[in-house]
């Protein structure tokens, strides 16, 4: 139910934003991005470069005003880390994970440029800020003795046990994306740029590590021996109840990328309502309907 509510909210926001943009401003862009993804959590507290993975995305951008744009984007990336890393402070715990991230985001972009310039006469280099809302899916996994396991299904912190253990966490979550970027005008229709965007999540389980070690005997009885092995890789027989993670600190992930965007006018959609977007008539030729 919660997942459906978030999906409906994003759909409604997208519909309203892009309908307004096409009706009033008449400029829309389509683009691609590629770059690096990383994470911060129990297994890596500093977005360590060692754990950087590749990510890519597609996006569409609608122009409200010269300084305000709205962007709908899809991102696919991967995050991961392990306790045996170069800067790890918890080698004894000996845990590791990796997870794909699939994200759909809606953000507002504020560009630092001259409001009186038309689109084709926009600044050569334009910095911007952005913030919005996103829904994403993840699924932490690990490889043990040559086999890959989905950790959420294992219940490494006793999620499927009887008693006062945490409930199984959802693999669909919401995040708050925000960051900074820049755009470089390549041609009248093309922009090339770079961006660094952080995602604040509301889950501490991107890495499947959050609370305490469960009772080994109870975990073995209800989930099997493999659950015990994946829960406690330190082989500490007295681990029950000891701290495994920190539930007070939610996990983060970041996407740093280069992107390319191609802009078209809504004259392609037989709409010529561009006067507010292009106050200096720099795109007047784009607003004139072709003669039959």
Residue map of PLM features:
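Bacterial Sec-dependent N-terminal signal peptides
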Residues: 1-26
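Primarily recognizes Gram-negative and organellar outer-membrane beta-barrels
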Residues: 22-55, 63-102, 120-122, 135-175, ...
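Membrane-embedded beta-strands of outer-membrane beta-barrel proteins
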Residues: 58, 106, 129, 178-180, ...
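Transmembrane beta-barrel domains of outer membrane proteins
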Residues: 59-61, 109-111, 181-183, 261-263
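Internal transmembrane alpha-helix with an interfacial aromatic "cap," most often the third helix
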Residues: 103-116
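Interfacial segments of alpha-helical transmembrane regions
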Residues: 123-127
């Amino acid at each position: 139910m919660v997942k459906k509510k978030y999906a409906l909210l994003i759909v409604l926001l997208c519909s309203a934003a892009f309908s307004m943009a096409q009706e009033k401003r008449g400029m829309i862009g389509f683009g691609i991005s590629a770059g690096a993804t990383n994470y911060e959590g129990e297994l890596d507290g500093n977005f360590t470069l060692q754990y950087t993975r590749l990510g890519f995305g597609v996006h569409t951008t609608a122009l409200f005003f010269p300084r305000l744009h709205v962007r709908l984007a899809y991102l696919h990336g991967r995050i991961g880390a392990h306790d045996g890393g170069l800067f790890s402070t918890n080698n004894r715990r000996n845990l590791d994970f990796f997870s794909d991230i699939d994200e759909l985001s809606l953000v507002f972009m504020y560009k630092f440029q001259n409001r009186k310039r038309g689109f084709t006469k926009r600044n050569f280099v334009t910095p911007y800020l952005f913030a919005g809302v996103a829904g994403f899916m993840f699924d932490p996994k690990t490889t043990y003795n040559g086999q890959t396991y989905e950790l959420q299904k294992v219940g490494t912190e006793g999620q499927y046990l009887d008693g006062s253990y945490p409930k199984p966490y959802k693999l669909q979550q919401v995040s708050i994306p925000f960051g900074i970027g820049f755009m470089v005008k390549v041609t009248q229709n093309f922009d090339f740029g770079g961006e660094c965007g952080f995602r604040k999540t509301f889950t501490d389980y991107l890495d499947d590590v959050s609370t305490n070690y469960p009772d080994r005997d109870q975990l073995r009885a209800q989930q099997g021996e493999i659950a015990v092995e994946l829960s406690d890789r330190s082989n500490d027989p007295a681990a029950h109840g000891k701290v495994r993670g920190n539930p007070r600190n939610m996990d983060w992930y970041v996407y740093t990328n280069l992107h390319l965007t191609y802009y078209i006018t809504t004259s392609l959609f037989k709409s010529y309502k561009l006067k507010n977007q292009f106050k200096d008539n720099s795109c007047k030729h784009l607003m004139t309907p072709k003669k039959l």
